[in-house]
């Protein structure tokens, strides 16, 4: 895209269509556009960095919940520990599907733990143990909701429209500006165009941290969730 801008600027220079004289106002316009883009990028990166923390927290909660349930089962073997493990396995695999694709809803899997909590209550498991597991269940649900929100909601959509508009206006202004020396100015126009266009593309990409696996190199990795899935899978034989 930046190469196209440079080529177009060169063509306009050859044709002599550069009616705008270079002035100090150009520096002010470029600074203002850069500020708006930087503000939007910093806000988007904040959500992206939060998204990077969520998989590790979710994986830790999943493994910890199973470990707690297995520990409880040793003293109170009154509930289906294999069923509980299977449900945690569904939650871990379901989170990956939910984050990558909107067609799957892991909330039903998370709520599927409630019957096991009821079995624990009937089996005489101390209330504080069950309360802790329920709190962890809420934490799983909170993580799922946060990921879903970040995936679907764009940060100040009007600001994104503004950023794209002013970048287009700025590039158009630079194209019709008589810049001296020309070739040095041509390089600067190409550099400015490249930076601003790349920043807009970066904002669009990182505003959706969880793409389908392998779609972009900037996706948030879910390898810790896969580790939790493998951990639960390895525990299957131990509960038999």
Q: What is each model feature region?
A:
Residues 65-157:
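Structured inter-helical modules in multipass membrane proteins
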Residues 16-38, 105-106:
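Acidic, low-complexity proline/glycine-rich segments
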Residues 52-69, 84-99, 220-235:
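Alpha-helical membrane-embedding segments
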Residues 35-55:
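Transmembrane signal-anchor/signal-peptide helices with a preference for the extracytoplasmic
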Residues 33-36, 43, 191-198:
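Hydrophobic alpha-helical membrane-associated segments
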Residues 19, 48-60, 79:
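Juxtamembrane membrane-water interface segments immediately C-terminal to a transmembrane helix
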Residues 17-20, 43, 132-142, 220:
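Juxtamembrane loop-helix boundary motifs flanking transmembrane segments in multi-pass membrane proteins
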Residues 1-25, 149-240:
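Alpha-helical transmembrane anchor segments
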């Amino acid at each position: 895209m930046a190469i196209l801008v440079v080529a177009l600027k060169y063509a306009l220079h050859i044709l002599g269509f550069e009616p705008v004289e270079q002035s100090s106002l150009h520096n002010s316009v470029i600074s203002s556009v850069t500020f708006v883009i930087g503000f939007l990028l910093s806000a988007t990166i904040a959500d992206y960095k939060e998204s990077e923390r969520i998989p590790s927290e979710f994986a830790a909660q999943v493994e910890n919940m199973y470990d707690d349930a297995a520990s409880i089962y040793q003293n109170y073997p009154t509930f289906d520990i294999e069923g509980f493990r299977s449900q945690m396995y569904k939650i871990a695999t379901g989170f990956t599907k939910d984050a990558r694709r909107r067609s799957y809803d892991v909330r039903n899997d998370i709520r599927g733990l409630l019957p096991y909590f009821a079995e624990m209550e009937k089996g005489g498991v101390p209330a504080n143990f069950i309360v802790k597991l329920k709190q962890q269940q809420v934490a799983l649900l909170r993580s799922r909701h946060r990921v879903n929100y970040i995936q679907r909601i764009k940060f100040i959509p009007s600001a994104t429209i503004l950023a794209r508009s002013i970048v287009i206006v700025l590039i158009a202004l630079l194209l019709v500006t008589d810049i001296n020396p020309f070739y040095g100015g041509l390089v600067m126009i190409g550099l400015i165009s490249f930076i601003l266009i790349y920043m807009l593309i970066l904002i669009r990409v990182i505003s959706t941290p969880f793409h389908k696996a392998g779609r972009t190199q900037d996706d948030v990795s879910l390898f810790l969730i896969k580790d939790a899935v493998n951990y639960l899978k390895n525990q299957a034989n131990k509960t038999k």
